[in-house]
Structure formats: C-alpha cells, structure tokens
Amino acid sequence: MKIFRILRITTIFIAAFTFTACTTTSHQQETEDYLSRIQTHKENGVSVSASVLSDNESLQVYGVPLARKGIQPVWIEVENNDDIAYWLMSPGLDPNFFPASEAAEAFSLLSGNVEKRKLEEKFARLAFKNPIPPGTKISGFVLTNLDHGVKMVQLDLVASGRLKTFSFMSVVPGFQADYHTKDVFGKQLYSTDEIINFIDDNEFRMALENLPCFVTNKNATRNGDPLNLVIIGGLDDAFPALVMLGLRPTEVTWSGSVMKMITSTISGERYRYAPVSPLYLFGRSQDLALQKARDNIHQRNHLRLWKSSMRYHGQPVWVGQISRDIGSRLTIHSPYLTTHKIDPDVDEALNALMEDMAYSQNLKKIALVKGVGAAPRNAPRQNLTTDPYYTQGHRGVMFFDPRPTSIADIEFLDWEGLPGGIIKASTKEQR
C-alpha cells in the first residue's frame, strides 16, 4: 500500500506538470465592483437589491481579509414604500450567518483596545440594521459563509401577517467557472431555424426518447456514461434551485485548479469546485458542470449539462449526465493518469438529485422517459474510464417554474409506466 501511494503521488505530479504546461497559467477576473453587479426585485411597494462581494472587494470594504476566515459579505438594500415595517431575516440568507460583533472579534484578538474598538465600530456601522419602517430605505451588509463562483441569495422580509421572499442567483467575481468560458447563458448556441419549441407533451416526450443514449469521447468513437437527465428551465428557476440545494459550479481546468486537485487528492481535503473531465454531446464538451461535494475530494455528486436546440413552451431544455464519485484511482484512460471512480448504481445519483429538487419549491413536474436502456447488475456497461455501471435505463425529466410549488403539489407524469409510477422502489432484487 505504501509503494502504491508513493507511485500514485508521483504519477499525479507528473501528470500535473505535463498538463499545466498546456493550460492557462492565470484566468481573467471579472470587474470587481459590487455596486455595478446589483440585482433588484420589486413586489407591491417593496424594492430589494443585493450584490455578493468577492474576496478582494470584502478586503477593500472591511480592511481585513474576511475570506481567510470563510466570511463573505452580501450587500442588501431594502426600500419600503408599503404601509408597514418589515424585518430582514438573516438566517434565510444563511442559517449560519456571522453577527457583525462575532466577525469583528475574530480579527481583533491581536489588536490593542483602541484598534479593537475601531474595528468593532466599523463592522457595526457596515451591518444591515433592522427594522425597515414605511417610507425608508435601509442598506448594509450581512456576513455569510464563503461561496465562490455563484451564490444563491434568498431574502425574507417579515411583518405582522405578511411575508415577502426575493431570490437572486448572484455571480461572484474572481472565479472562472466553466460556464463562463462558454458563455452558455449569453451566447446563442443555435440559429433560429435550429430551435424547436414543443407545446405538445407527446411530441416532446418522443423527442426526449430519441436523444442520444450516451456521452462520448471527443471523436465520438466510444460511448461513456448514460445521458440520464433532462432539465427544463433556466436562470429564473432551475439553476437557482440547483444552487440553493448545494450544487456548485466547477472551475475551469487551469494551472491553479490542477494544483488544487493535486493537493486535495494527496491530503484528501474537500475541493467544492474541483474541475470535471470533458465529455461530449452535440459535438462539444459539456456547457456547464455542477457538483455537490462531500468532505473530501474523492466523493461528490456531479452532473454535466448541454443546452439542446429544444424548447418546451419557450423554456430551455438541458440534457445531462449525473453520477456519484466514490473514490479515485490510477488509469491510462485519462490524460491526468488518475480518475474518479463512479458508484455503479447511477440511478441512485439521479434519484438523489430529484429528491433534492423536490425541496427547492421550484420543481413543478417530474417524469421518466426511455433512455439508455436497462443494464442489470450482473451485466453492467462501462464508461470511458472502464468503470462499470448498472441502471434501469430511464431518464429523469424535471420541469421547473419560478412560482413556488410545494412537494404535495408536484405533478408526477405517467410518461413511462413503472410499477407504482415514478415513485418505484429501487430494490436490489429488481436489478
């Protein structure tokens, strides 16, 4: 085991030095001016604005490196033209938010009494202060736990007998996510003639069943993981739901992210934004990838998504692949000479995602359609790195909507007839 560990570490370093020679040594950062990134929502006389600060911006505003202690300020402004006072609920933004006094104390331990008092006064002055009386505009910062790339900002304003909820998906500068590189949300991937907008459910179902079964390698000469996921929605519903339930963007592969991968692989530490390898559909690698990491780099749920030329009642249709990493190993089938090992039960990762999304309140409908076809446990298929997997062979289809939907009101479409409908127990005997 010791010899294998030494070999593995040596191989990782060789792969890293080989690979980083071909990668960008730095990545472009977005303009770091949080006031230029303000997002605003309005509802019945109440206007709410928000912006999430980068590491450098928080240093400039507070004068201390908040990010080093895992703290991230969110700037909030509430203009109340209603007839009643509101209270901003900080736990709605982050259940583990940092009160200003606690955060100031973390940076004042080595300061003298005068400097400590100045720091405490500054943190208190910058903090958002409740309540928000009628006819007033209140602004300030709430100190949250650090996120890179993107942050889901949910703001709950309460009053006697009233609740107003505002949600933002806010980009955080200083982090190069893969979807930034492709500009998947801003660029027109398909011509007007290529886009097909489905309004008939049966036609849409047939189109989903006729999608390719697998991702492939770059040359499309070998099949990989099953395409087992379809998401209908966009920046107003599907992606806020994914982020809110813990999925995070993956970093592009560059020298810095490769080195983080190396150190995390050796130490076993968590890397919430670790890059994923490229897989191919529609002649291109994934448009974006998201992952939900555990406490170490070897274990994570990750999904890759491609924007298709289909629309459903005008909404974007994303085709994807989801699986769960349960370890890592050496391989000759990856340019890095190491790869994550997937859980062979790929349906479990899909089921976990659908269950997560049910709690998002943005999931409106859910269905199964025919996909890759069944691969039983005793006759599994293999992905591109030769990991075996087994599956019932269906695709999970999730329809999102900006309007809240409780779990009890989610519609289960009977597109694919399974015993008990879509809520079918995945027992080992059935495999």
Positions of the model-derived regions?
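The feature marks short-to-medium sequence segments in extracytoplasmic or secretory-pathway proteins
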Residues: 81-132
